[in-house]
From Swiss-Prot:
Keywords: Cytoplasm, Nucleus, Ribosome biogenesis, RNA-binding
Lineage: Eukaryota, Fungi, Dikarya, Ascomycota, Pezizomycotina
CDD domains for the chain: KH-I_PNO1_rpt1, KH-I_PNO1_rpt2
Organism of provenance: Emericella nidulans (strain FGSC A4 / ATCC 38163 / CBS 112.46 / NRRL 194 / M139) (Aspergillus nidulans)
Protein name: Pre-rRNA-processing protein pno1
Physiological role: Required for small ribosomal subunit (SSU) synthesis. Has a role in the processing of early nucleolar and late cytoplasmic pre-RNA species.
Encoding gene per record: pno1
Length: 258
């Protein structure tokens, strides 16, 4: 019989070790694998929610109806525009500046200044600007004033989205006009004391500016076409009476339409 303090044989130690059951290892591996699908389940749930946000359905008339998009905070980025001012419009711009900058600053939330050295009006967005098209509207407003339109007419570009400015030269209509013939064409468009121009404006619901050999027309797309047709007819030499008759017909059609 060995002493109580004697070392045990190696064979006894090996016989006392209990091997790990393979089933237990497989069970541990299954537990580790099951950890990943829990995260995938969250991803699937998030993708399902995003799919619900962009869900599309068809209404009774067969038109697609989308769920409204959520408002996301847009990144603030400074954008600038420069509107060149002709030399002959610099003095009117300075005189009417107290009436020009309030709509740009208060309505569009833009930063604006006159650069005397470069003879331009500089526009810049601020952190208070919410309309993405504010910079373009401000540029159109200032450009309309530099072309010769009144402030009240130019402000309409800020309030209405369907107004445009179309510009063309008299020689674009008839390239052979020179000297006195060109002067007579300009006189036919303007009329005595501007009566012909006012008649075209009232009939076509537009505003017309005659700047030397250039014609600028402000209004809606269809109205601009009507006004341009009358101006082109006068340039080509049509009698004013015939042009007035055509304008009356156009005005009657517009009245019936609206």
């Amino acid at each position: 019989m060995p002493a109580p303090t004697a070392l045990r044989a190696a064979s006894d130690a090996s016989t006392t070790e209990t091997p790990i059951a393979p089933h237990a290892q497989e069970h541990d591996e299954e537990i580790l694998i099951d950890v990943q699908p829990s995260n995938n389940a969250d991803d699937v749930l998030a993708s399902a929610n995003s799919a619900e946000d962009t869900d599309m359905r068809i209404d009774l008339e067969g038109r697609p109806v989308f769920t409204p998009a959520k408002d996301t905070p847009a990144a603030y980025r400074v954008e600038t525009r420069k509107v060149p001012v002709p030399p002959h419009r610099m003095t009117p711009l300075k005189a009417n500046w107290p009436k020009i900058y309030p709509p740009l600053v208060e309505h569009l939330k833009l930063q604006v200044r006159i650069n005397i050295k470069s003879r331009a009006v500089e526009l810049r967005t601020s952190k208070f600007t919410t309309d993405t098209g504010a910079l373009q509207k401000g540029e159109d407003f200032v450009k309309a004033f530099t072309l010769g339109f009144d402030i009240d007419d130019a402000i309409a570009l800020l309030r209405l989205d369907d107004l445009y400015i179309r510009s063309f030269e008299i020689r674009d209509v008839k390239a052979s006009l020179n000297g006195e013939h060109l002067s007579r064409a300009i006189g036919r468009i303007a009329g005595k004391d501007g009566r012909t121009r006012h008649a075209i404006e009232n009939a076509s619901r537009t505003r017309i500016v005659i700047a030397d050999q250039k014609i600028h027309i402000l209004g809606r797309f269809q109205n601009i076409n009507a006004g341009q047709e009358a101006v082109v007819s006068l340039i080509l030499g049509a009698p004013p009476g015939k042009v007035y008759g055509n304008l009356r017909k156009v005005a009657a059609r517009m009245k019936e339409r609206f």
